[in-house]
Amino acid sequence: KIDSDQIFITTGSSGAFLLTFLSCFDKGSRVAIFSPVYPAYRNILKSLNIDVVEIFPDKNEIDKINPFLISKQKVDGLIISNPNNPNGQTFTNNELTFIYEHCKKNKVILISDEIYHGIEYGERAKSMLNYGNNAIVINSFSKFFCMPGWRLGWAIIPRELKENYLKLS
């Protein structure tokens, strides 16, 4: 169940990312991203002096992200995009379960960019909200509703992060 005080309205998804990074990480925190990836994550994190840990595909898999590689990293946060931007990969139920459980067990802040939900091919991508209440889900009206100029996004956050978000929003 999501309560209304867990939803923060932002200036597009970029505003949600900035608010989330400022609310959750300090200078020198380590945040992992799977490459290939939407460049704004890397750029915003670096501008805040947050260390970016890029997880690249296996040597023989140029464009397939292997989420199990996260277990080899010591990080404070993980950003996933599902479906992925730019390669369109959609994580399986087993992969999402692994990501969620790994982050929960290791106290890694999990941020799920779900802006491409609803416009994927094949089976519909699952929201990280289906796996529990320890993830931050970011979305906007830009893609699914074809409203990019409106700059209207949101973040759904775990209750324990609410005070951090309120200080900055």
Region annotations inferred by a language model:
Residues 22-82, 101:
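PLP-dependent aminotransferase-like
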Residues 59-123:
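Active-site phosphate-binding strand-loop segment of PLP-dependent enzymes
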Residues 14, 82-86, 143:
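Short glycine-rich anion-binding loops that position phosphate/pyrophosphate groups of nucleotides
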Residues 133-169:
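Conserved core segment of the aminotransferase class I/II
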Residues 7, 31-32, 45, 78, ...:
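Generic structural signal for small/hydrophobic residues in well-ordered secondary structure
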Residues 16-17, 40, 117-119:
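Catalytic P-loop NTPase motifs of RecA-like helicase/translocase cores
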